[in-house]
Structures are given as C-alpha cells and as structure tokens.
Amino acid sequence: MTLFFQIEYTVRPGELLHVLLSGSYPDGQQWSYNLPMTTADGQHWSLATTVLSQHFRSRRAGRQKTDMLSFGYHYQVEDAEGRVLRREWTVVARRCECRADSRLRFADRWRDVPVTAHL
C-alpha cells in the first residue's frame, strides 16, 4: 500500500509540515504516525509512504491480518523541536478506507478554522 500526500501551504523558515495518520484495530487499540513532509520551496509539500502496509501484513499480538483499513489524517506545522505551531481544522475529519493493494493520492488544501467556528 502506498499513500501519496500533496499540499500547498507556505511556512516560515525553520517550520516543517507534517501529516498525522491515525486509526484503530477492530479490538479498539489505536495507532498513529506523525510523518514529516518534504519541500523544495517551503510552499509545495509532498510525502510518499508505505507505513500503513504493516497493518495488512502483521499478526502482532494475535491480531488477524486485515483486508481493509480505515484511517484519518490531518496536517500540522511543527518547529525543529517538534512543537506544534499550527494545526488545520479537524472538526470535519479526513477519512479513508483502503485495501492492501491500494495506491492512493491525496491532493489537499489546508483547512483553516472557520471564522464562525466559535458560534
């Protein structure tokens, strides 16, 4: 399984954009990954990863190999020490369901907190 993430978002020097993936096994145990993205110009970011492939192949702790996997993801800006500086709006989650042989491309836009979110 390969996931391709692309997003256009301008950051300040020293800031990095990350994509956070999260989900859970059928038994309720949760998993998550914080993956740094790469950029050549500080504005166009990308990441190709196979990190979720292990959830299809492994039988860790007696878990059965799964045919389908559901996960959510969002983006955040971090400094060089890993402190979160900005996080996109996550009230409406980005969710995906996929198979082990999936090759998915996510061409996203940053989702700011709406001005009326406090209402």
Predicted region positions:
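Intrinsically disordered, low-complexity regions enriched for glutamine and histidine
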Residues: 4, 27-28, 116
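Compositionally biased low-complexity segments at domain edges in trafficked proteins
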Residues: 102-119
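Aromatic-rich carbohydrate-binding modules that target alpha-glucans
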Residues: 10-68, 76-102
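A short, amphipathic beta-strand motif
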Residues: 2-8
